[in-house]
A protein has these predicted regions:
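Short, compact, well-ordered microdomains
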Residues: 118, 122-139
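Single conserved hydrophobic/aromatic residue that forms the stacking wall/gate
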Residues: 155-163
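Short cysteine-rich clusters marking metal-coordination/redox-active sites
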Residues: 28-31, 58-61
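Short metal-coordination and nucleic-acid-contact micro-motifs, chiefly zinc-binding Cys/His arrays
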Residues: 21-27, 51-54
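Long, highly charged low-complexity segments enriched in Glu/Asp and Lys/Arg with interspersed Ser/Thr
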Residues: 137-151
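Short recognition patches in nucleic-acid-associated and regulatory proteins
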Residues: 33-48
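Short metal-binding segments enriched for Cys and/or His
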Residues: 59-82
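Positively charged, polyanion-binding regions of nucleic-acid-associated proteins
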Residues: 89-104
Length: 163
């Protein structure tokens, strides 16, 4: 791990402890090797998209090719490790949701509530970074099948900010 573990701030120290603990627990679903937190430049090279970002990368990379992005603030994984095919499906699922959001002029949280209702999942389960290829295909299909005029009217409750 490249980041310093010793720190003055108690909160930051706790975050680092959680990261180290989490890092030990992450295993690749493809080859069962451990995954480690690495600079994104390992995978992407010295590109603008890699600057200051981190990934959890299978320790057998590049042979295995499984990785997942880390949250910028907490450095916890954004989902499960994914190979190239699954990463591509997740990108397509995010694009489908974004298109539905734009077509319906919805907030992001509204789109996710719509998706939760359609998939019968709760908020903790509705993260594309956790989805399999099958679930990503379901998201894409639901978004493509949703008539814009209907899907825009499916969720009309007040926002959590209004409550």
């Amino acid at each position: 791990m490249i980041l310093p573990v010793k720190t003055q701030c108690r909160r930051h120290r706790r975050v680092m402890e959680v990261i180290l603990l989490k890092q030990k627990q992450i295993k690749c679903p493809y080859c069962h090797a451990h995954a480690s937190l690495r600079p994104a430049s390992l995978v992407y090279g010295a590109t603008p998209q890699a600057r200051g970002k981190y990934l959890y990368v299978c320790d057998r990379w590049p042979v295995c090719n499984a990785y997942v992005s880390a949250h910028e603030r907490t450095l916890l994984p954004m989902g499960t490790l994914a190979n190239g095919d699954l990463r591509h499906k997740r990108i397509l699922a995010h694009r489908a949701l974004k298109k539905l959001q734009q077509d319906c002029q919805m907030e992001k949280w509204e789109v996710y509530i719509w998706l939760q209702a359609k998939l019968g999942l709760d908020a903790r389960q509705t993260h594309i970074g956790q989805f399999s290829e099958y679930m990503c295909e379901q998201v894409i299909s639901l978004c493509q099948q949703a008539p814009v005029y209907t899907s825009c009217l499916l969720y009309t409750s007040p926002s959590p900010r209004d409550a």
